């Protein structure tokens, strides 16, 4: 009698986005079971001398191009934090809106995670420093070059999504008991 081989695990490609009006980090990873693989990452920079609408268009057009190039199955965006500078918070909100809209327009499901949730998923503590996050991203994704912190943060958002996705899948299969 032949034993049945375990079912093949699906590979899911995810785009992580760390939105900002000046610099938006992005990172693409693949998850197969609990294995993660780095695909690409980078930063979208806008010209601060341009108008806000022009900068948002650059952000939208570039994110759309990334969606066409990398064909992610899902996307994840870091939630906005509120700081003392109301104008800066509003501009960050504009960029975040574009980061949520671009994948949605291509029918790519979008998840949102707060900074503490991302740090907890990647480092194990919600109070992790940027250096700790970057170190763990490099450990979890060998080959990622992380030229800018924004790209590392975007990859961390994608890793967080992969972990949360795996947990939800285990609950749905009944593999985890309450």
From Swiss-Prot:
The keyword Iron does not apply. Disulfide bonds: none annotated. Mg(2+) 2 binds at residue 78. InterPro entries: RNaseH-like_sf, RNaseH_sf, X-over_junc_endoDNase_Mg_BS, X-over_junc_endoDNase_RuvC. Gene3D superfamilies: Ribonuclease H-like superfamily/Ribonuclease H. It catalyses: Endonucleolytic cleavage at a junction such as a reciprocal single-stranded crossover between two homologous DNA duplexes (Holliday junction). GO terms for molecular function: crossover junction DNA endonuclease activity; DNA binding; magnesium ion binding. Binds 2 Mg(2+) ion per subunit. Keywords: Cytoplasm, DNA damage, DNA recombination, DNA repair, DNA-binding, Endonuclease, Hydrolase, Magnesium, Metal-binding, Nuclease. GO terms for biological process: DNA recombination; DNA repair. Its EC number is 3.1.21.10. It is found in: Cytoplasm. The active site is at 18, 78, 150. Its cofactor is Mg(2+). Mg(2+) 1 binds at residues 18, 150. The keyword Magnesium applies. Homodimer which binds Holliday junction (HJ) DNA. The HJ becomes 2-fold symmetrical on binding to RuvC with unstacked arms; it has a different conformation from HJ DNA in complex with RuvA. In the full resolvosome a probable DNA-RuvA(4)-RuvB(12)-RuvC(2) complex forms which resolves the HJ. NCBIfam families: ruvC. The RuvA-RuvB-RuvC complex processes Holliday junction (HJ) DNA during genetic recombination and DNA repair. Endonuclease that resolves HJ intermediates. Cleaves cruciform DNA by making single-stranded nicks across the HJ at symmetrical positions within the homologous arms, yielding a 5'-phosphate and a 3'-hydroxyl group; requires a central core of homology in the junction. The consensus cleavage sequence is 5'-(A/T)TT(C/G)-3'. Cleavage occurs on the 3'-side of the TT dinucleotide at the point of strand exchange. Belongs to the RuvC family. This is Crossover junction endodeoxyribonuclease RuvC. The lineage of its organism: Bacteria, Pseudomonadati, Pseudomonadota, Alphaproteobacteria, Acetobacterales.
């Amino acid at each position: 009698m032949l034993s049945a081989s375990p079912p093949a695990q699906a590979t899911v490609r995810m785009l992580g986005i760390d939105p900002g009006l000046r610099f938006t980090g992005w990172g693409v990873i693949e998850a197969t079971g609990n294995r993660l693989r780095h695909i690409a990452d980078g930063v979208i920079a806008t010209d601060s001398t341009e108008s806000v609408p022009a900068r948002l268009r650059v952000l939208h057009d570039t994110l759309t191009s990334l969606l066409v190039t990398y064909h992610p199955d899902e996307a994840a965006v870091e939630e906005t934090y509120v700081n003392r500078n109301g104008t800066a918070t509003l501009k960050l909100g504009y960029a975040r809106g574009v980061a949520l809209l671009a994948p949605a327009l291509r029918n790519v499901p979008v998840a949102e995670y707060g900074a503490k949730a991302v740090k907890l998923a990647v480092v194990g503590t919600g109070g992790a420093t940027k250096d700790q996050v970057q170190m763990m991203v490099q450990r979890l994704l060998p080959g990622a070059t992380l030229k800018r912190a924004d790209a590392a943060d975007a990859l961390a958002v994608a890793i967080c999504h992969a972990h949360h996705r795996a947990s939800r899948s285990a609950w749905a299969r009944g593999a985890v008991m309450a």
